Amino acid sequence: MQQLLNEILDEVRPLIGRGKVADYIPALAGVEPNQLGIAVYSRDGELFHAGDALRPFSIQSISKVFSLVQAIQHSGEDIWQRLGHEPSGQPFNSLVQLEFERGKPRNPFINAGALVICDINQSRFAAPAQSMRDFVRRLCGNPEVVSDSVVARSEYQHRSRNAAAAYLMKSFGNFHNDVEAVLFSYFHHCALRMSCVDLARAFCFLADKGFCKHSGEQVLNERQTKQVNAIMATSGLYDEAGNFAYRVGLPGKSGVGGGIIAVVPGRFTVCVWSPELNAAGNSLAGIAALEKLSERIGWSIF
């Protein structure tokens, strides 16, 4: 496995320079673009990694999975009264579909859906940002995971579209807490800094029927685990989820920080990171690396 990971990074490295680092978040625009890392973690605790897999980066929308899991833990099926679990077919920050569907987001991984999930969690936790940080630390076994306040502040200063979505949902009665307070929590979730190794470990419960090896806790039950993996498979890569399923064939979730997490149910989790994005906002070299890994080992769920 170690040799294979090294080979794959060598093969996809020429793609660096063809994408573009996210620049709509000023604090992310200065990230060094030629970084590339990959980590594979098995449900038995075996770890393999290559490249910049130990270097922390801004996980951004990957955090939406952690938020969803927290909401499922304390509210269960009730969350689906306020949002759906269908692909949107629209940009992740679209307002048009949200208004047409009367303030009920299509799924928890578009921005509006993630904000509803954060609103649900805001009602549950006295300090949502801290609760999220502590939750993630338990999942990955790394007490050094922190939220980057500079990135969070930068995103908060450019919050207009997310605020518009939240207030639109509030006008339809689907947002219960103070919008600014929820946005504060949301951006601190997105600004969490984790490495490929951290994320591969943190997501391994989704490859093991909801059981987290590091904390020894049953994070989700088997049915809930299947549901989260299903939503990742259909909606985890913005409006490129179909292409990712076609090329990689695994449940996944991406973020504009350049990270992608993928789950091989019953076996492994894989995290790749390369900051340069394609036109859909997903890591260009990251998708190519996952495609090669899936092809060579036969990990596709299809």
Curated annotation (Swiss-Prot):
Keyword Membrane: no
Protein's UniProt name: Glutaminase
Catalytic activity: L-glutamine + H2O = L-glutamate + NH4(+)
Enzyme Commission number, as recorded: 3.5.1.2
PANTHER family per record: GLUTAMINASE (PTHR12544:SF29)
Keyword ATP-binding: no
Binding site for substrate: 61, 111, 155, 162, 186, 238, 256
Family that this chain belongs to: Belongs to the glutaminase family.
InterPro entries: Beta-lactam/transpept-like, Glutaminase
GO terms classed as biological process: glutamate biosynthetic process; glutamine catabolic process
Organism field: Pseudomonas aeruginosa (strain ATCC 15692 / DSM 22644 / CIP 104116 / JCM 14847 / LMG 12228 / 1C / PRS 101 / PAO1)
Pfam families: Glutaminase (PF04960)
GO molecular function: glutaminase activity
Keywords: Hydrolase
Subunit structure: Homotetramer.
Cystine connections: none
Cross-referenced SUPFAM superfamilies: beta-lactamase/transpeptidase-like (SSF56601)
